[in-house]
Amino acid sequence: EILIGLVGSEMCIRDSLNFSEENQLLCSDMSFDALFEPDPEHPYESMARRLLGNTFNGPMSRRADKIAEMALKLHANGVVFFCHWGCKNTIGGAGLVRDRLEQEGIPMLTLDGDGCDRRNINDGQMRTRLEAFLELLEERRRAR
């Protein structure tokens, strides 16, 4: 079984991984922005801590470190990084995240597309690139 971490929108790869017996999508970085238990006695402080701890607030290096941390913690075989067209943050940060993951020996696939309008995504091309990446991950897994 190949374990995949995801950065950004999953809509570009959902169909390829749904109900797959060979591959499993572990998580999206959008869901682990600030993992801590809120204090019900101090809801506003808890909200502030969550906002300040969000990986989207601050430098991309912090987000890259968190992505690497979660990929290691969840034993991901690879990471798919979705870059939304026109988003300077994700496009500019993709290389930084790739470099950080390479330090840990985790390969990354970058997919570019429109995260807002699915009609602007070439599903066939994305599926082909994802399948090639999954084959690479499978070869790496067998070689170990």
Write out the residue ranges for each language-model feature.
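Charged, low-complexity surface segments at secondary-structure and domain boundaries
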Residues: C12, A34, D114-R118
